[in-house]
Amino acid sequence: LQCYSCINQVDCTSVINCTXNQDACLY
């Protein structure tokens, strides 16, 4: 699993608890 900032949601397969600048994208 790798975490990316909310700004990079495009590269995420699924988004979980994406708030502010916290890393939330997991795949």
Curated annotation (Swiss-Prot):
Tissue localization of expression: Expressed in erythrocytes and lymphocytes. Not detected in platelets.
Glycosylation sites: 17
Post-translational modification remark: N- and O-glycosylated.
Domain of life: Eukaryota
Localization terms from the record: Cell membrane; Secreted
Xref: InterPro entries: Snake_toxin-like_sf
Keywords carried by this UniProt record: Cell membrane, Disulfide bond, Glycoprotein, GPI-anchor, Lipoprotein, Membrane, Secreted
GO CC term (a single one): plasma membrane
Primary location: membrane
Its membrane topology: Lipid-anchor; GPI-anchor
Disulfide bonds, paired cysteine numbers: 3-25, 6-12
Record SUPFAM superfamilies: Snake toxin-like
Subunit structure comment from the entry: Interacts with T-cell surface antigen CD2.
Function: Potent inhibitor of the complement membrane attack complex (MAC) action, which protects self-cells from damage during complement activation. Acts by binding to the beta-haipins of C8 (C8A and C8B) components of the assembling MAC, forming an intermolecular beta-sheet that prevents incorporation of the multiple copies of C9 required for complete formation of the osmolytic pore.
Name this polypeptide is given: CD59 glycoprotein
Organism: Ovis aries
